[in-house]
């Protein structure tokens, strides 16, 4: 048995989109078959059925109503799938044989433009990447807004990952032969990004002509070939999926990576620039703290400003001056914001115009939006700052477009453009004439109903309409005896009524329906003409939309500054960051007002180059370091900052090594990840960079960690090509000695108050190093059991009391009732264990600090040998094992007992079956066997 004609057609279409789920239009449904059906039924929770297809087995099948497709498509695209839409290309009733079908669009994560899928304040970027030898180029487009950005640089994975982190594309288009290891790196860092591959020829084909045709600002001599290839490949993919040249993508914007503040992937995450660390949502991020925008366009623009802070003084100061002027004119600012609230998403509306998917209601939204532009232009004329003056000169009021839309479209048109009820009365004579005919016909129908009621005496008689039978007279069965003989022609019999027609009624029906059909056709034709006119003027509307979004951003920054008592920072060229009473812009918003403790900061490239911060955990070191970085970023986007005074030098890069890393989930150790991040910082930072380092060396032994931290400080301060502004938090108090030996190191600490054996974190950064870590007190605050706290204090007293001796013997805790004992030897000579064999200990060489500091090359780093401390654990019968550890081991059997006791206390015996009770008892008995 052969395949059915319909199934042959399906398989032919499917062959052209193997990587997509094919939505195959059959009547009023999109059907999916074979593997596509299995995937869709699982993802969309649809019933999987079957269909005879000419094979021995029925083809797996599931389907969705075509009018509800967007909901299902959105779910599949969100899960990373691509959808190919195969439509009927001819009227089934007029076709002979099988209906002609074809793919009209391929929907992918980076090209989906349905408003229910998109976040209004966030771009939906698709990215292309092209690699050629040691150079790479990247292009980013948002087809819903028309943005298209390109850049290139020397190829470094870190650079590419930084740009991906900045733009957060939903999809990346790559050349099909690119190394899988690079794709793996991307997927490891950004698991939610969809990867698509195209052939090399799609990047190369007809480059200059394609770019000239698409971009009205393209000059082939201004762009490197690799940039043009990247842009060409992305344009090919967009056209391949959309089956259309999108007129809203009409300008290519080239940017240089070095023209903006570089914030690498880890730093964006650690500083919580646009999303918080825990939930990966906007709340709790810098963007959340600064976003008071009133338009979707402004929300997206503010995100871009925060993702790409400026590094040139003039544009930064232009923004700052504009924000200052808004703060000095509160009344004008409020008027501006009030009009901004009435502006819809112009960029995405004209994007729908370009894709021919806009409806009349959206054009009314466009009309209302551009109707506010003349008022905004008038407000701008009252300002004096350069940025506002330039905006006032450049903004297009679009009055001709507003006039057309106001004259042509009804204020409340139909949602569908193919159902009529779109064009306003007086715009077109033929529309008015047909509407009158339609209206008169319906009046005639109403008068007919009244006349028939009166002449027959049937009060319940009514004239109705449906699409199957047209107009008809309906009389209930109870009144059929009142129907005059021969007055009506029977049309349909129902269970409780009869339906009739008359020749006059059918004649009027033809007039009414003919008028309605013609009216719908004419209204749709007029609508497409209006849409085409708007499409011809997309560039004008996009320019105005960008100005509105900039105004919205500036108003947002002014509002936040006013509400939170921010001040205007001074931008200097002295390589100095001076902040008086600085505050963390996010933390102060999530704690009661006025409770945040402000702190001063002074960092430069000379005497205060590396600020060494000591103090206990939870005291506020990380918050302090982050606030310095965030204040710097805020200043460089043109925002006022949370401080009493701020003198900020422009930074080219910000690096952080703070907190845990996502790479831990990929199987990399804490220490390895930390060292990789530190290595990246030391290789890429410059004298213009700001570096935040928190607890460098914590992931290994004390001596190794101290040595590495010491060496990193030396490298930063003594390397003449580096000397970056650095905040360095540490628990290694030995490092505080470096202030006396290395130029630029300054000791600071977090003040702590001790009251009746309790500590209070004052959150104040003061000069001088901390004299102790308060680790046990922090552990107590964290809720460690009191036996652990008491034992820790006991051990600490032994260590501190005997630290000058060569060996340290710590007696076992009586509370633990353990027969083990621990001997920690610090003797540098050979000793003998209980079996008489020699145990050798490496010696920790005494380091001459002065010698290290005087070494100008900084290539000789702190060298020390790790001291192996052998712990011998003995019991009464024999030596069980011998281990070499970095500290001492403690028997924690009591913790196991506590857990078992707690488990027994929590047993709900009344709600357990006898068998459940028996199993629980058996489980507890097994657990107690592990306890001596």
UniProtKB/Swiss-Prot annotation:
Superkingdom: Bacteria
Transmembrane segments: none
A molecular function GO annotation: mismatched DNA binding
Classification via InterPro entries: DNA_mismatch_repair_MutS, DNA_mismatch_repair_MutS-lik_N, DNA_mismatch_repair_MutS/MSH, DNA_mismatch_repair_MutS_C, DNA_mismatch_repair_MutS_clamp, DNA_mismatch_repair_MutS_core, DNA_mismatch_repair_MutS_N, DNA_mismatch_repair_MutS_sf
PROSITE patterns: DNA_MISMATCH_REPAIR_2
One BP annotation, GO: mismatch repair
Residues where ATP binds: 615-622
Alphabetic keyword roster: ATP-binding, DNA damage, DNA repair, DNA-binding, Nucleotide-binding
This protein's GO CC annotations: cytosol
One Pfam family per UniProt: MutS_II
Protein purpose: This protein is involved in the repair of mismatches in DNA. It is possible that it carries out the mismatch recognition step. This protein has a weak ATPase activity.
HAMAP family reported in the protein's UniProt record: MutS
Family note: Belongs to the DNA mismatch repair MutS family.
Protein's name according to its UniProt entry: DNA mismatch repair protein MutS
Originating species: Clostridium botulinum (strain Hall / ATCC 3502 / NCTC 13319 / Type A)
Gene that this sequence comes from: mutS
């Amino acid at each position: 048995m052969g395949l059915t004609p319909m199934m042959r057609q399906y398989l032919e279409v499917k062959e052209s989109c193997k990587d997509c789920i094919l939505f195959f239009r059959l009547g009023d449904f999109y059907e999916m078959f074979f593997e596509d059906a299995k995937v869709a039924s699982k993802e969309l929770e649809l019933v999987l059925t079957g269909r005879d297809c000419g094979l021995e087995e029925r083809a797996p099948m599931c389907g969705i109503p075509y009018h509800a497709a967007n909901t299902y498509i959105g779910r599949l695209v969100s899960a990373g799938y691509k959808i190919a839409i195969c439509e009927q290309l001819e009227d089934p009733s007029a076709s002979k044989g099988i209906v002609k079908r074809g793919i009209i669009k391929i929907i992918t994560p980076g090209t989906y433009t349905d408003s229910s899928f998109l976040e209004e304040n966030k771009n939906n970027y698709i990215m292309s990447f092209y690699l050629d030898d040691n150079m790479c180029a990247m292009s980013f487009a948002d087809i819903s807004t028309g943005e298209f950005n390109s850049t290139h640089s020397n190829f470094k994975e870190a650079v590419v990952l930084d740009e991906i982190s900045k733009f957060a594309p939903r999809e990346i288009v790559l050349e099909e032969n690119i190394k899988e290891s690079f794709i793996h790196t991307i997927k490891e860092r950004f698991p939610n990004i969809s990867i698509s591959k195209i052939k090399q020829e799609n990047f190369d084909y007809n480059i200059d002509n394609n770019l000239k045709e698409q971009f009205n600002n393209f000059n082939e001599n201004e762009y490197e070939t690799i940039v043009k290839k990247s842009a060409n490949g992305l344009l090919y993919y967009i056209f391949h999926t959309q089956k259309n040249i999108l007129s809203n993508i009409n300008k290519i914007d080239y940017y240089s990576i070095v023209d903006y503040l570089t914030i690498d992937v880890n730093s964006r995450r650690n500083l919580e620039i646009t999303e918080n660390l825990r939930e990966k949502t906007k709340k709790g991020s810098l963007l959340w703290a600064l976003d008071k925008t009133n338009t979707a366009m402004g929300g997206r623009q503010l995100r871009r400003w925060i993702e790409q802070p400026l590094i040139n003084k003039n544009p930064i100061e232009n923004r700052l001056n504009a924000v200052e002027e808004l703060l000095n004119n509160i009344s004008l600012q409020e008027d501006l914001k009030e009009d901004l609230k009435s502006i819809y998403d112009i960029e995405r509306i004209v994007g729908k115009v370009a894709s021919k998917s806009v409806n009349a209601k959206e054009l009314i939204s466009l009309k209302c939006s551009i109707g506010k532009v003349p008022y905004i232009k008038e407000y701008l004329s009252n300002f004096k700052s350069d940025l506002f003056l330039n905006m006032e000169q450049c903004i297009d009021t679009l009055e001709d477009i507003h006039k057309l839309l106001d004259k042509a479209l009804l204020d409340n048109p139909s949602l569908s453009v193919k159902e009529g009820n779109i064009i306003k009365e007086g715009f077109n004579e033929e529309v008015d004439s047909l509407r009158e005919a339609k209206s008169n016909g319906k009046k005639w129908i109403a008068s007919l109903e009244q006349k028939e009621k009166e002449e027959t005496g049937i009060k319940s008689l009514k004239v109705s309409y449906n699409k199957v039978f047209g107009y008809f007279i309906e009389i209930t069965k109870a009144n059929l005896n009142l129907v005059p003989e021969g007055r009506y022609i029977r049309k349909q019999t129902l269970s409780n009524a009869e339906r009739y027609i008359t020749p006059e009624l059918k004649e009027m029906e033809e007039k009414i329906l003919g008028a309605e059909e013609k009216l719908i056709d004419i209204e749709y034709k007029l609508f497409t003409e209006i849409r085409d006119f708007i499409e011809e003027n997309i560039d004008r509307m996009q320019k105005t939309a960008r100005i509105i979004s900039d105004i919205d951003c500036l108003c947002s920054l002014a509002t936040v500054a006013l509400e939170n008592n921010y001040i205007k920072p001074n931008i200097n060229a002295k390589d100095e960051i001076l902040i008086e009473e600085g505050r963390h812009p996010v933390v102060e918003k999530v704690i009661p007002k006025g409770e945040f403790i402000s702190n001063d900061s002074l960092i430069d490239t000379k005497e205060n180059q590396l600020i060494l911060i000591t103090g206990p955990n939870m005291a506020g070191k990380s918050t302090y370091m982050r606030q310095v970085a965030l204040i710097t970023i805020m200043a460089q986007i043109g925002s006022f900052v949370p401080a009493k005074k701020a003198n900020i030098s422009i930074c080219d890069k910000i690096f952080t090594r703070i907190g845990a890393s996502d790479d831990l989930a990929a199987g990399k150790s804490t220490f390895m990840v930390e060292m990789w991040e530190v290595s990246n910082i030391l290789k890429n930072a410059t004298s213009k960079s700001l570096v935040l380092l928190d607890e460098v060396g914590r992931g290994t032994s004390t001596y190794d960690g101290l040595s590495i931290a010491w060496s990193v400080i030396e490298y930063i301060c003594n390397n003449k090509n580096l000397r970056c502004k650095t905040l360095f938090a540490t628990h290694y108090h030995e490092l505080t000695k470096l202030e006396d030996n290395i130029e630029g190191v300054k000791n600071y600490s977090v003040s702590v108050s001790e009251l009746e054996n309790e500590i209070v974190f004052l959150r104040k950064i003061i000069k001088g190093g901390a004299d102790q870590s308060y680790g046990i007190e922090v552990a107590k605050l964290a809720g460690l059991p009191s036996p652990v706290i008491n034992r820790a204090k006991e051990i600490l007293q032994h260590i501190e009391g005997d630290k000058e001796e060569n060996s340290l013997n710590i007696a076992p805790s009586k509370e633990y009732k353990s027969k083990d004992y621990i001997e920690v030897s610090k003797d540098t000579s050979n000793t003998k264990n209980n079996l008489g064999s020699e145990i050798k200990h490496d010696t920790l060489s005494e380091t001459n600090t002065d010698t290290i500091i005087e070494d100008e090359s900084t290539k000789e780093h702190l060298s020390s040998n790790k001291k192996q401390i052998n712990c011998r654990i003995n019991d009464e019968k024999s030596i069980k094992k011998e281990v070499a550890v970095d500290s001492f081991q403690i028997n924690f059997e009591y913790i196991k007992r506590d857990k078992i006791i707690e488990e027994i206390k929590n047993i709900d015996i009344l709600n357990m079956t006898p068998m459940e009770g028996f199993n629980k008892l058996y489980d507890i008995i097994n657990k107690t066997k592990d306890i001596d």
